[in-house]
Curated annotation (Swiss-Prot):
Lineage: Eukaryota, Fungi, Dikarya, Ascomycota, Taphrinomycotina
Transmembrane residue ranges: none
Matching Pfam families: RNase_PH (PF01138)
Assembly and binders: Component of the RNA exosome complex. Specifically part of the catalytically inactive RNA exosome core complex (Exo-9) which may associate with the catalytic subunits rrp6 and dis3 in cytoplasmic- and nuclear-specific RNA exosome complex forms. Exo-9 is formed by a hexameric base ring of RNase PH domain-containing subunits and a cap ring consisting of csl4, rrp4 and rrp40.
Protein name stated in the entry: Exosome complex component rrp42
GO terms classed as biological process: exonucleolytic trimming to generate mature 3'-end of 5.8S rRNA from tricistronic rRNA transcript (SSU-rRNA, 5.8S rRNA, LSU-rRNA); nonfunctional rRNA decay; nuclear mRNA surveillance; nuclear polyadenylation-dependent mRNA catabolic process; nuclear polyadenylation-dependent rRNA catabolic process; nuclear-transcribed mRNA catabolic process, 3'-5' exonucleolytic nonsense-mediated decay; nuclear-transcribed mRNA catabolic process, non-stop decay; rRNA catabolic process
Primary site of residence: cytoplasm
SUPFAM superfamilies: Ribonuclease PH domain 2-like, Ribosomal protein S5 domain 2-like
Annotated PANTHER family: EXOSOME COMPLEX COMPONENT RRP42 (PTHR11097:SF8), EXOSOME COMPLEX EXONUCLEASE RIBOSOMAL RNA PROCESSING PROTEIN (PTHR11097)
Amino acid sequence: MQLSLPELSYTHKSITEFEPAIRNDGRSIDQLRPLSGQVDVLPGTNGSARVKWASSVEIVIGVKAEVGDATPEGGKYVASVEISPSVSIQNRETDEIPSFLTSALQDLLNALAVDYLKFTPSKAWIIHVDAVVILSSSPYENILSALSLAAYLALQTTRLPKISTPNVTDITIGSTKYEPSEEYDVDSEWENALPLQGLELMSVIILVSSIDQVIIVDPTIEESSVAQVTYAIGVQASGAISYTRVVGTGGGYASTGRAITVERYIELLETASTVGTKLLNASSDILSFKGLGFFDILP
């Protein structure tokens, strides 16, 4: 998205020359855009969620579990992100956005435990986390945050059929304490299905930008364009940082022109941690309203 010099100048001055900073959509510097979510939206899946990020981004995720070959670590999570035909991107055959989003989601999933997904010496659950971007006003919008939040909610609602194996009486989902047998039974009763484990390690991604002396959360395209740098930062429910990636270097229009300092980098991490934990805490309320429509998330 090409912005004019007057647009860049106005955005930069509004943020850096006023106290408090004036953002073009009226938010405070540490405020996310309005967002809402819904869970259990896709019949036939093991878990699902849908998230709207402002009026510009909407993502739906379905989680499907299948029995597959065990890995040395146990089972595995497999991410996939597609862009709906209704979303305009330059060239669907060569565009890097789907692969970038898939890679980012896979990085978050790789933090989750998979050892317990193995239930025989050679078989384990393979968890497919499939996302579709069904609305994006621009490929440069904040898709990462919506994607990670939708994945978090979908995994929270996911249930796996209970597995029984010979000579094992205490089964959660799978078990690393089994007799060396390839026999197993899958319980088809949904009410006996069990939740995923270790989801406290799943992260939500918060975007933060440094614009001269100001740090802003969830930057717009205009704000990212005048920032020295924009980071995507993964935050777990505990506030721990699990993921960092530079996703924009706007060139610092009319800025100091200097690279950010270590101290500023730490400030960016701390800001993301605070906002991310609030978002995860607020989003947990949605889980009580399965299938009842969209609910606002107010971190």
